[in-house]
Amino acid sequence: EWTGFKSKEFPLFSAKCRVTDDSLMTCAVAEAFAKAQQEGRLGEDAYVEGLLAHFMRTIGLRYPDAGYGSKFLYWLQHKELGPYGSFGNGAAMRVAPAAYFGRTLEEVEHLAMVSARVSHNHPSAYKAAKAVAGCAFLARKGADKDGLGAYAGRYYNLHFTVEGIRDSYRGDSSCDNSVPQGIVSFLDADSFEDGLRNAVSLGGDSDTLAAIAGAIGEPFFGIPPLLVVEARKYYLPELKKWENA
């Protein structure tokens, strides 16, 4: 992340591997949605937003060095704070659970927006969250890449390839300069792992690009069992809970 690394050739696992802020916040969103669903209150936005803030702070402060942006970390540390207008890609990196708790595309898009606005209440963040969650949902329902590209193309210009932008791309943590690249990392891939490698090879905010590519790639390609076995070695308790959900 942020090293300017520009290659698909790297060991997928190493002794330096650790869970990222992306994964932890995805678990927090899943916890909030699951609790609301169990209580029959998933349709009550204000209640769900309260749960989201609670679980994000509870899990986030358990691992304060996971790699959060400075503004989001400050938000985590001050429970009295509401959303702060962020257009950062944190709204997209954590949104995957919406694709599993929404029953229709419209519900998924709404849950995506709810998950974003607890901290990232900006139109760019809403757009990003809906695009990623919607793609993941449609992939779960059997959409092909043409269909997924057409759907995501409602939100972003995707007329580029990973190979075509790799050398010139200079990423940042804004939604508009990272979410399209994460989606195209999936669209240009021929496997789940290839999507991750595409994302990392672009440099920039590589863990978030990979979180986006992986959120769509898992329901589309599936994850090879051997890769799961290796990844499990790095799981924290928060991730283990959702392994077979």
Protein language model regions, located:
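Structured, active/binding-site neighborhoods that engage oxygen-rich ligands
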Residues: 1-245
